[in-house]
Amino acid sequence: MRSEPVGRSGHSAGPGLQSVLAHVAAAGVALLSALLAFPASAFTVFACEPEWAALTRVLVPSARVHVATHVGQDPHHIEARPALIAQLRAANLVVCTGASLESGWLPVLQDRAGNPRARDVFFAADHVELIDPQPGAIGTPWAGDVHAEGNPHLHLDPRRLLQVSRALGERLGKELPAERLAIEQRSRAFEAAWRQHLADWERRAAPLRGRRIAAQHTTFGYLWHWLGVQPLADLEPKPGMSPTPGHLQRLLEGLRASPPAAVVIASYQDPRPGRWLTGQLSTAAAGARVPLLTLPATVPETAGEKELVLWMEGLVRELLQGLR
């Protein structure tokens, strides 16, 4: 006859107690796995955008990386949530874009986190030449998202992304001197592989040069600059301001005679203005359909090197298919 397990009181441990014990054991295993994956001493990075989180993972795979934003968000406008404050408080290094992209929310997080290390931010924009600088420009609620330093969306140029990866590797090597040689090796390996992809993307994207598009915001400005695509119009009346009926009507009148090859928006933007404009332009173009292309402006939050490559590959592929 099978005996039941006996507890300290001498009573049998029934199925209910066995189930509880099983759940407790499973939870303990899960917690132990998490602790092993990220030791208490793990170097912690707070990345303002997913692209910098991905580069950090390429260079220091053992780092614990927190990401403030995701592909479905406009990085200009982020709420200073308690979870972000806690993550910034624990950070050994903060990696952001700069060029005032995070000026509306990062200082608030820094003030509330009270972490001196969070003040010495690695800003990607400090390590590349920015396009479209506007010296003396000041962003106001009436002027929109104006960046005096230049367009902050620099990660959409794979050449500049490579420059940032090199500079970030140097900074991480200083932060982690014991791992400096390993970081340098990973940086060189990433650069070699990325350059191979870059040559392939540029060769395949050659037909895009000179193609004309309308877009919402300057999110993809570096992509157009790299590929030689010509932006004709912006759906926003002012940078960062939502498209208005009056502005869209003026765009329609200006583009009707010679429609663009496509209208392009980021995946976090409202598709309705672009949908209306492409519908009107397609009607005006006597049967020639003007497509609305919705592109991801960055990688997933958990991305690494593979996802960076797939993301850039996807952008080139979508443009080749959409701008025929």
Which stretches of residues belong to each language-model region?
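Short amphipathic alpha-helical segments with coiled-coil-like heptad repeat character
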Residues: 2-4, 191-192
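Bacterial N-terminal signal peptides that target proteins for export
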Residues: 3-28
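N-terminal signal peptide c-region/cleavage motif recognized by signal peptidases
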Residues: 37-39
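Extracytoplasmic metal-acquisition and chelation regions
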Residues: 42-324
